[in-house]
């Protein structure tokens, strides 16, 4: 990620912020990544995860709408998700 000074951030904190994650279909994909999200947003409601399987059923897309409290929190969450072995893409 680029180092943008906080005063130039386009996001106002706190705010609800959607994060989309894609990976190969796996029975524990949603649960495993929900646990990662909860490390950065303990108030996150796991029931709010939006799940969309790919047409072929080989991949799963998840949307987590987290309560973003700082740029550092979002950057750390993105790094944790991006580095997870089950994750192909984070948007």
Swiss-Prot record:
Taxonomy, superkingdom: Bacteria
UniProt feature coiled coil, ranges: none
Family: Belongs to the UPF0250 family.
PANTHER family documented for this protein: UPF0250 PROTEIN YBED (PTHR38036:SF1)
Protein name, per record: UPF0250 protein BPP0168
Lineage per the UniProt record: Bacteria, Pseudomonadati, Pseudomonadota, Betaproteobacteria, Burkholderiales
């Amino acid at each position: 990620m680029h180092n943008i000074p906080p005063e130039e951030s386009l996001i106002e904190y706190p705010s609800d912020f959607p994060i989309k994650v894609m990976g190969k279909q796996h029975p524990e994909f949603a649960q495993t990544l929900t646990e990662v999200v909860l490390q950065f947003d303990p108030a996150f409601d796991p029931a709010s995860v939006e799940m969309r399987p790919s047409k072929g059923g080989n991949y799963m897309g998840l949307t987590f709408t987290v309560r973003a409290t700082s740029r550092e929190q979002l950057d750390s969450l993105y790094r944790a998700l991006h580095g997870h072995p089950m994750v192909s893409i984070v948007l």
